[in-house]
Amino acid sequence: MVIPLVTGLLGRDGQDMPLRLADGGTVERGVLVLDKQANTFTFKDVREQPVLSINRSFSAPIKLTTNVSPDDLRLMAAHDSDPFNRWQAVQTLASTLLVGNVARLRAGQDPEADEGLLEALDAILADSSLEPAFVAEVLVPPSEADTAREIGRDVDPDAIYRARMGLRALIGLHLNKRLTDTYGRMVTPGVYSPDADSAGRRALKNVCLDLLAATGEPHMIALASKQYQSADNMTDRMAALATLNQHEGAARDAAMDDFYKRYQDDPLIVDKWFNLQASTRDPGTLDRVRALTKHAAFSLGNPNRVRALIGMFAQGNPTQFNRADGAGYDFVADHVLTIDPSNPQLASRMLSAFKSWRALEPGRRARAESALSRVYETPNLSRDVQDIAHRALVDSDRKSTRLNSSH
């Protein structure tokens, strides 16, 4: 197999070094071609120990393992001329920090910061040559789901959420002025336009707003409320509402009420309203979702509405679905059983939210297994739901004989 790797050598000043092979060969467009089991490339005129920036622009669709040090990653995050590797360096640093802070929080310790990561993000925000859409992507920390996959086992969703929220707040505090200035600069004047440049500016503006509000500062919550009220397009209004949705209080409640009143006659937008309320991480979410199942606009006979509310709760809210008391599991299991007779495809899709239960910490793992077993042992299940439950409960280490109850 031939693997083309676009490669660069970064000096300690963050600038690209010239690529000159010691054997006199040329490196066209920075591409090193791997065509053997092992390839060796020796460069000349290398003035100092470089940082290797490899697989730039994701030139080869491969999983790459490297031994880049944290300090080298910080340099790449701040200076690499290749956007993909710059983004990858930020993601790796942030992921490492989050995984470490999850462990610290679970041990009762304070989370740590990575000053080099914060400085790199500051440099990215200050770099006017970068596309706003790219900067917006870089500023978003790895998701809770990504962090859980990185941890792999004994996962505590609450600790992951606290670590991620803490990092977002830290970015918002440390880069407050830069984020505030960028927010102002990214406002798109004039009539709304869906072109790529305007869309990128809106994306960056809304990420800045979200990070600023993550600090919990009242004037930043007020800024989100102001954007919600003054928005002239759905992208900005939804972004402001999603930001407010993360912060309990009068501002969130007022915006949620207003949003429903504005758009109650548009089914697709009402789905978004249900979606947001099911995704908020505060402890009252399950009670709110239960109440919303009685709302005049909700019906178990409307699959889109069920997906928007119960589906989002199950698959898009890892802290509240995976509540330590197991109430989230029971709520979803109950609705799977209620919906299965009339819509087995929808019910099985909801049940698939349990697929990662074995990766959870022991308490949640036991409660999730109990809810799954209750579903599986219910008589007259549809084939769809029975299959999902069976596959979730049986693995290579466990014989399925105890599960072969009559249905």
What residues fall within each predicted segment?
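Positively charged, low-complexity/disordered segments
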Residues: 403-407
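Beta-strand elements of well-folded, non-transmembrane domains
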Residues: 7-13
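Surface-exposed loop/edge segments in extracytoplasmic proteins
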Residues: 13-21
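Short coil-to-beta strand junction motifs in C2/discoidin
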Residues: 1-5
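Short proline/glycine- and polar residue-rich coil/turn motifs
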Residues: 23-39
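Short intrinsically disordered coil segments
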Residues: 20-26, 57-58
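Long, ordered, helix-rich scaffold segments
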Residues: 10, 44-398, 402
